């Protein structure tokens, strides 16, 4: 068992982020995850997905916008534990 209360907060926050990611449209989530988790550039993602870099930029910006709205209530928690 973990005794650090921050562990449970981080675990809950991670779960909420994962749930929010799953609710994104597939095209937004794919571009976002390739950029943020696979560290691919917009150009690399564009080549991989066979779309323009502008389309990749749009999809990632939309994903961020939706995630900000969805996770806005958790920002104070995140800031408190950092």
Q: Where in this protein do the model-derived segments appear?
A:
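Acidic, proline/glycine-rich intrinsically disordered inter-domain spacer in sigma factors
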Residues: 1-19
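C-terminal edge and immediately downstream basic/flexible tail or linker adjoining helix-turn-helix-like DNA-binding
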Residues: 48, 64-82
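Residues within the DNA-recognition helix of helix-turn-helix
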Residues: 59-62
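Helix-turn-helix DNA-binding module
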Residues: 19-22, 26, 30, 38-55
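Generic non-transmembrane alpha-helical segments
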Residues: 16, 20-24, 70-74
């Amino acid at each position: 068992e973990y005794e650090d209360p921050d562990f449970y907060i981080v675990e809950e926050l991670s779960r909420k982020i994962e749930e929010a990611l799953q609710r994104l449209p597939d095209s937004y989530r794919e571009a976002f995850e390739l950029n943020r988790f696979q560290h691919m550039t917009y150009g690399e993602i564009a080549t991989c997905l066979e779309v323009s870099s502008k389309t990749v930029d749009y999809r990632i910006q939309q994903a961020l916008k939706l995630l900000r709205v969805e996770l806005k209530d958790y920002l104070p928690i995140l800031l408190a534990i950092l």
